[in-house]
Amino acid sequence: MRPIIKENFSILFNENGYLELADFILKKNYQNILFLTDANTEKYCLKSFKKSICNINSKVSKIIDSNSFYYSLPHGESSKNIDESIKVWDFLIQNGFKRNSLIINLGGGMVTDIGGFISSTFMRGIDFVNVPTTLLGMVDASIGGKTGIDFKNLKNIIGKFEFAKIILIDDSFLETLNDQQIISGFAEMIKHALIDSPNHWNTIREIKSLKNISKDMVYNSILTKVNIIEKDPTEKDIRKYLNYGHTLGHAIESYLLGTKRELLHGEAIAIGMVLEAYLANKVSGLSIKELEEIKEAFKRKFDLIEFDKKQINSINELLIHDKKNSHGNINFTLIKSIGKYVIDQQADEKLIIEAFDYYLK
């Protein structure tokens, strides 16, 4: 996979990526380096990552051996909060971290989100590198400069735009994932295909097995996102296309967070995409044919999640806190047809309830 070099960030891959990261660390001569992980990536990925970068040359190995610190967050979205951020900030202060320091966020979307937020706010900003270890992190969460934490059960309600200096994608980490983690990331790949083009959509929706997800498909998904954020890094216009499925998806994810029915991010967004496809049929002119195509594609890959009337009402109430809202309106990104979108669309509560009815059929 070819490196993707942009003005604000670089996305590097596998062995060549490690070479470039090692060179970057040597040139920057960081005073301290923090490896930020969660319990899973500490167990399954940290040793492999350190070995890969330390094997580049003895100088890098010496820097990492002498200047590095390690902090592991509890696993799961519930750790992406202000309390855990404070603990890491305190750890950085106690260990003498200054502006000439680096944080390497090794993990899935939770780690890269909170790690980027911690880095971008500590001493008004220190450098950070994202090393995503999940499919969702590789194609979506680690790319694009969105950092943040959850607060009062609201997704990513506190955060800022700040780009990682480097995003290093090592696809061998995908071997550490279970099917649930893969399918969660695949949801974002479906989203990228839907907003990109009919050809991309047809390629993705015809995948019969998770084992058929190829490196080329992952790379094309990354390129789709990069091509959008390059034109609109702070989400003033076309970057809002990437919010398809995320208005209702985030509300569902927030509502179920911390319960026995808690969903991974991609699982919640998958539901959101079906719901918002129904809204698109009613509001922005998506054809019945393409609506049914979208629903069927998700039905084949994702389990149906049941919601009763009370739960749907509670999810609706969460929508008023969505950070994409403006002037009292709940804003949706809706499809006109595969590859064509409209932003800042509205739908009333009655239509949203109808969308849940459609999803549950």
Task: Identify the meaning behind each predicted range.
Residues 110-117, 250-251:
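Short glycine/serine/threonine-rich phosphate/pyrophosphate-binding segments
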